[in-house]
């Protein structure tokens, strides 16, 4: 019976694509995972149990969703492509613990949806095979949301995975690195070759596991802290001082406030943002806040 064959089986994947006249859509960054070993390793990395509520982002034709449904209590899958939603209604028919929501996860009040679907105070695990072009904004939104999550296991481009734990002063170090450092610990779970997909992407992939961390220095407004960080990286080759002038203004009064803030935080204005660690950015934010400059 065809229905007993895993969706990720290469033959069945191709049959589904043929049946619905599907092609991977570049605008949605679609590549279909056809390596069952990788899928099993993703579920294992997420430590999915029969008591777990799972959020999946970008289910595609349901290859990963199927494996999650076999292990989890309930799976809530967000799919932006209406054509894929139609396919999922068929491929996931055997699983009554899966609900597919046709929406862009970046435009959803995830905390509200989780409360409605899983109940108040539910802890969730988030699993995703993310389109590479949108990996960073989705990760940042998830980490900065107020949802309770036990872990996040995400497939991403290997180059992006390397940025998560990039060292201070390196080319890969930036806003994403600092966001991860503030909220989570990132570990490389699986390396995934391009041959694991249909069609094969032009880059290798990696599965990364994020586990929540308590910040070493808690600030009262995380959004403003990362506003400072983002502004500091607005032009990587410019000095911190020049980026701050562009962000806060160039009038004499503002320059004086910036000078006081930098001195208070003990930061050289000529330094580039990539040379500052999270603690230094935190101190800079607090100093700018004291000068009423945080936006």
Swiss-Prot record:
SUPFAM superfamilies given in the database record: S-adenosyl-L-methionine-dependent methyltransferases
Entry's Gene Ontology molecular function annotations: 16S rRNA (adenine(1518)-N(6)/adenine(1519)-N(6))-dimethyltransferase activity; RNA binding
Reactions accelerated catalytically: adenosine(1518)/adenosine(1519) in 16S rRNA + 4 S-adenosyl-L-methionine = N(6)-dimethyladenosine(1518)/N(6)-dimethyladenosine(1519) in 16S rRNA + 4 S-adenosyl-L-homocysteine + 4 H(+)
Top-rank lineage group of the source organism: Bacteria
SMART domains: rADc
GO cellular component assignments: cytosol
Assigned keywords, A-Z: Cytoplasm, Methyltransferase, RNA-binding, rRNA processing, S-adenosyl-L-methionine, Transferase
Keyword Metal-binding: no
UniProt-listed Pfam families: RrnaAD
Positions of S-adenosyl-L-methionine binding: 31, 33, 58, 79, 104, 129
Subcellular localization, as worded in the UniProt entry: Cytoplasm
Top-level enzyme category: transferase
E.C. code: 2.1.1.182
HAMAP family, per database record: 16SrRNA_methyltr_A
Record-linked NCBIfam families: ksgA (TIGR00755)
Function as written in the Swiss-Prot or TrEMBL entry: Specifically dimethylates two adjacent adenosines (A1518 and A1519) in the loop of a conserved hairpin near the 3'-end of 16S rRNA in the 30S particle. May play a critical role in biogenesis of 30S subunits.
Family: Belongs to the class I-like SAM-binding methyltransferase superfamily. rRNA adenine N(6)-methyltransferase family. RsmA subfamily.
Protein name, entry field: Ribosomal RNA small subunit methyltransferase A
Annotated organism of origin: Leuconostoc mesenteroides subsp. mesenteroides (strain ATCC 8293 / DSM 20343 / BCRC 11652 / CCM 1803 / JCM 6124 / NCDO 523 / NBRC 100496 / NCIMB 8023 / NCTC 12954 / NRRL B-1118 / 37Y)
């Amino acid at each position: 019976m065809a229905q007993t064959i895993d969706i990720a089986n290469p033959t069945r994947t191709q049959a589904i694509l043929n049946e619905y006249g599907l092609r991977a859509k570049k605008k949605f960054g679609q590549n279909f995972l056809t390596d069952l070993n990788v899928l099993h390793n993703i579920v294992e990395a997420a430590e999915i149990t029969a008591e777990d509520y799972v959020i999946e982002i970008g289910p595609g034709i349901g290859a990963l969703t199927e494996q999650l449904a076999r292990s989890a209590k309930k799976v809530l899958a967000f799919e932006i492509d209406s054509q894929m939603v139609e396919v999922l209604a068929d491929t996931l028919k055997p699983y009554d613990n899966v609900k597919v929501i046709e929406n862009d996860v970046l435009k959803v009040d995830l905390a509200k949806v989780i409360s409605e679907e899983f109940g108040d105070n539910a802890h969730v695990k988030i699993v995703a095979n993310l389109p590479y072009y949108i990996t960073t904004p989705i990760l940042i939104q998830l980490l900065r949301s107020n949802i309770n999550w036990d872990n996040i296991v995400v497939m991403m481009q290997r180059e992006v995975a390397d940025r998560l734990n990039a060292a201070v002063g390196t080319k890969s170090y930036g806003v994403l690195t600092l966001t991860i450092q503030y909220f989570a610990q990132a570990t490389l779970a699986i390396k995934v070759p391009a041959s694991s997909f249909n069609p094969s992407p032009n880059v290798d992939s990696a599965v990364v596991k994020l586990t929540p961390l308590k910040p070493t220095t808690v600030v009262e407004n995380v959004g403003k802290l990362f506003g400072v960080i983002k502004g500091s990286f607005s032009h990587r080759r410019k000095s911190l001082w020049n980026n701050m002038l562009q962000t806060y203004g160039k009038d004499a009064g503002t320059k004086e406030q910036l000078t006081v803030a930098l001195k208070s935080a003990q930061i050289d204005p000529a330094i580039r943002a990539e040379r500052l660690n999270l603690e230094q950015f935190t101190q800079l934010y607090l100093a700018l806040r004291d000068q009423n400059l945080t936006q």
